[in-house]
Design a protein with these regions (language model features):
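Short hydrophobic beta-strand element within catalytic cores of glycosyltransferases
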Residues: 278-283
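Aromatic "clamp/platform" in nucleotide-sugar-dependent glycosyltransferases that forms part
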Residues: 242, 261
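Short His-centered aromatic/hydrophobic patch
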Residues: 91-97, 115
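Conserved acidic donor-binding segment of nucleotide-sugar-dependent glycosyltransferases
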Residues: 294-296, 300-307, 315-321
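Donor nucleotide-sugar binding/catalytic pocket of nucleotide-sugar-dependent glycosyltransferases
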Residues: 135-170
Length: 353
């Protein structure tokens, strides 16, 4: 079976990581896998040698915004699908889906698409276009039941819920070796790092030996630094950027924090749970955190945007080592249900059976 995966790029991000895991698994099982990037040639995730990777700068060829640009992009994608001639086409990002599915449908390819974020954030025009694309697909994959229920019954009937596979060979947390509260995310509004800083400022009195360490890059960096200074915690809020050893740092940290306003399923959250980092996460749409965190059993759930509850949850973990140890030991059990050997065969069945 020849499978074409179309994406913007393979730079750091949850969608990109999951697609790389799926691509490598399918190739290992003997399928021909072709990964086509159309926005940039940035590759941050390993692809197996028998995965064909190709960058075609479709998104950079046409500069002027408008319907003509969209038509030209879709026309070029149509040509690439015809050239590669796959049996099945897989798309995750909505911008990729609406641009590639019509061409794949016209060429009678098996189409599998996946909703990766809170579907309610889009306005009516985007929802209509997305639904047209989903109607053309053979199968639609959702990360959560809440996301699945958002769509009409005709979409639900041909859909399945498949959570994200874990990164392979994750280390285990041995013991807390520093006082870092770590986040791993892009610095953009969806992640609401502003709330994390405000919560940390409330947590800080009595916990002056702790730091909030935010790994990641993005357009909000300077305003986040300014907020930390305004709250008087600039010395204890640091932004190291992207690091290659984030999993090792998760094994050493005091706790992991995610304050997103909405998510599909946070990959860094799943990794933190699997490693055993005591975790505090917002119970945000579309329900990914609550799928895997039972409050005060294997982590802490807090309401979206609630800095007081977030500060209190951090304090509970910091002030009660026995509690922190208990939720850490419980959270690693997630490995039993989210290993690539459990998740990826479900993708293979959709694409290749």
């Amino acid at each position: 079976m020849k499978v074409l995966i179309i994406l913007n790029d393979l730079k750091n991000g949850g969608v990109e990581r999951v697609l790389s895991v799926i691509a490598n698994y399918l190739a290992e099982k003997g399928h021909q896998v072709h990964v086509l990037a159309i926005a940039s040639d940035c590759v941050s995730y390993h692809l197996a040698q028998n995965v064909t990777y190709e960058y075609v700068p479709i998104m950079r060829i046409y500069k002027k915004e408008g319907l003509l640009k969209e038509f030209k992009i879709m026309s070029q994608i149509h040509k690439e699908i015809k050239r590669i001639n796959p049996d099945a086409v897989l798309g995750f990002d909505d911008s990729i889906i609406i641009r590639s599915v019509p061409s794949a449908w016209l060429q009678r390819k098996r189409i599998v698409v996946s909703e990766r974020i809170d579907p309610s954030i889009y306005g009516l025009p985007m929802r209509i276009v997305r639904q047209v694309a989903y109607d053309m697909a053979k199968s639609v994959v959702f990360q959560t039941v809440d996301a699945q229920k958002f769509f009409p019954m005709r979409t639900q009937r041909k859909s399945i819920v498949i959570p994200n596979p874990l990164t392979e060979n994750l280390p285990y947390r041995v013991a807390e070796t520093n006082k870092d509260i770590i986040m791993a995310c892009r610095l953009r509004s969806q992640k609401n790092v502003h709330m994390a800083i405000r919560a940390f400022a409330k947590f800080y009195p009595g916990h002056e030996d702790y730091r909030l360490v935010v790994y990641g890059e993005g357009e909000q960096l300077e305003e986040l630094k300014a907020l930390a200074a305004q709250k008087g915690v600039a010395e204890n809020v640091v932004f190291p950027g992207h690091v290659s050893d984030i999993h090792k740092r998760m094994t050493e940290c005091a706790m992991y924090l995610s304050t997103s306003d909405y998510e599909g399923i946070s990959n860094s959250m799943l990794e933190a749970l699997a490693i055993g980092a005591p975790s505090v996460c917002t119970d945000c749409p579309v329900g990914g955190a609550r799928m895997f965190i039972e409050n005060e059993v294997n982590g802490m759930l807090v309401p979206v945007g609630d800095e007081d509850a977030t500060a209190a949850a951090m304090a509970k973990i910091a002030d009660d080592p026995a509690f922190a140890k208990a939720i850490s030991e419980e959270s690693v059990k997630i490995r039993q249900i989210l290993g690539a050997d459990v998740i990826c065969p479900q993708w293979e069945a959709l694409l290749c059976d």
